[in-house]
A protein has these predicted regions:
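Sec-dependent bacterial lipoprotein signal peptides
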Residues: 1-17
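Short loop/turn and low-complexity linker motifs enriched in small/turn-promoting residues
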Residues: 17-149
Length: 149
């Protein structure tokens, strides 16, 4: 009796695990990742590298003198920052481009890290929220430097 009870429990557990993905509604499957509001008094910056770009060279992102992180392929990073202006740079294998941004409390902004001309350079380009959210949903998260302000 105990053996059959254990077998039934194991079978039901396996069935429940297998159905977990299928139990999501169409809305949940379509929405994907949740975009949390920035922390109180902070702004959220998303830095994204798109997978449609065939160039796989490293792009290093810095803010002032601090490294934010490196994007080697498709992925995204989120940085929560207090309101201020920031000097962001995207470094390719040969050079970099600067982008100075001003952020306000409560806002979320999206930036695309991409290769630029001449070859070996990289740049950050601000994109609209719907496009940024779509790209974030398609890519894995890459954790950024936790010691940033």
């Amino acid at each position: 009796m105990k053996k059959s009870l254990v077998a039934v429990v194991l079978a039901l557990s396996a069935a429940a695990c297998a159905q977990e993905q299928g139990m999501k509604s169409e809305w949940q499957l379509g929405y994907g990742k949740t975009f949390y509001a920035p922390n109180n008094g902070m702004a959220a910056l998303y830095i994204i590298r798109d997978e449609s770009n065939p160039d796989t060279s490293l792009i290093d992102i810095t803010m002032g003198r601090e490294s934010v992180g490196t994007l080697a392929g498709p992925g995204w990073m989120r940085v929560d920052l207090p309101p201020s202006y920031y000097d962001l740079r995207a470094y390719g294998t040969e050079g970099s481009r600067e982008l100075v941004v001003t952020v306000n409390a409560g806002e979320s902004r999206f930036f695309l890290a991409q290769s630029s001309t001449p070859p070996g350079n990289a740049q950050l380009v601000e994109i609209l929220q719907p496009e940024g959210r779509r790209l974030v949903r398609q890519s894995p998260r890459i954790y950024s430097n936790p010691s940033l302000p």
